Amino acid sequence: YKSCDLIRKLKELGHSVKVVPTPSALKFVGAATFEALSGEPVSATVWERVDEVAHIEIGRGADLMIIAPATANTIARLAHGAADDLLSATVLVTKAPVVICPAMHSDMWLNEAVQNNLEILKQRQFHVIPPAVGRLTGSDSGVGRLPEVTEIIEESLSLLQGSKILTDMRILITAGG
């Protein structure tokens, strides 16, 4: 649910926000909620709109792309160039900086495969904000929580300082993974 707060705070800062939720994200938060928070229509699949090529338009229109939360599955698909959904296809199109905000169970976060996939993304100039430590889903605690919204915003916008005026930016948020 932090992705909803992220959208709200970015809008309060004067940025345009477009949300590209994964099917998993829509199981947690409905498209209507994302649309209400962002003030923009929500696309979740490549095939929803016949009047535009969604991943091309969305990817080209973004000044910054934030993937929050980024699951182990999403990280793996991005690291290996998958383009089988709107999120991954949009990542392949965008020239904007991409910020990855991992969120998963500690055992998954510490898994060698996840760490290797993150290294691949870092080599491609993706910016990774490490997960926070705290209570996880269920009764477990440890590393794996989505970073706090203020940290995500500060680190993400710092990537653009010096290159753009930091108001009225078009920020793409992908929710869930």
Functional labels for PLM-detected ranges:
Residues 1-99, 105-177:
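A cross-family phosphate/adenosyl-ligand binding-site feature
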